[in-house]
Curated annotation (Swiss-Prot):
Gene3D superfamilies: Translation initiation factor 3 (IF-3), C-terminal domain (3.30.110.10), Translation initiation factor 3 (IF-3), N-terminal domain (3.10.20.80). It comes from the Bacteria. PANTHER family: TRANSLATION INITIATION FACTOR IF-3, TRANSLATION INITIATION FACTOR IF-3, MITOCHONDRIAL. This is Translation initiation factor IF-3. Monomer.
Length: 172
């Protein structure tokens, strides 16, 4: 078997008869595997099994090395086009002072202007766990300060010892 899984080339194809298609789209019809292999050899190309489950199996005459190179190139292009969303985390406590809130809001605004998502986390310590609503209230206060330049992606919710809220840059 060839290096890639489920791709059969040339002599690896076990079917006695195949439906053969040329690299340029020429349909050779249903012919024996040997005849298809001869045509491929005369052209200096490979016989590649495309649809093994079809009756009869479909083979294509092509330059397999070139085909594989183009597939890898397409995958690299697709990977480049994918945008990685960076999430910045800002941790707060319930007893944070107003000037500290302002400082953290300033950082959040910078992150949002850079197009990054921001996750605000309020850590609940000790007895604060008994009343997680104070964390939600805290994040609602934060939301009032950032709502002019952010959209709320996730409302404040308790997750373990944290109350989390996710905001994204405002669109448009």
């Amino acid at each position: 078997m060839s290096k890639e899984k489920d791709v059969y080339l040339n002599e690896e194809i076990r079917a006695s008869e195949v439906r053969c298609v040329g690299d340029d789209g020429t349909a050779y019809g249903v012919i024996s595997r040997g005849e298809a292999q001869d045509i491929a050899n005369r052209m200096g190309l490979d016989l590649v099994l495309i649809a093994p489950d079809a009756k009869p199996p479909v083979c294509k005459i092509m330059d397999y090395g070139k085909f594989r190179y183009q597939q890898e190139k397409k995958q690299k292009e697709a990977k480049k086009k994918q945008k990685v969303i960076e999430v910045k985390e800002i941790k707060l406590s319930v007893k944070i002072a107003q000037n500290d809130i302002n400082y953290k809001i300033k950082h959040a605004q910078e992150f949002l202007e850079e197009g990054k998502h921001v996750k605000f986390r309020v850590f609940l310590k000790g007895r604060e766990m008994a009343t997680p609503d104070i964390g939600v209230v805290m994040l609602e206060r934060i939301w009032e300060l950032v709502k002019d330049y952010a959209d709320r992606d996730k409302v404040p919710a308790l997750e373990g010892r944290y109350v989390n809220m996710l905001v994204t840059p405002k669109k448009g």
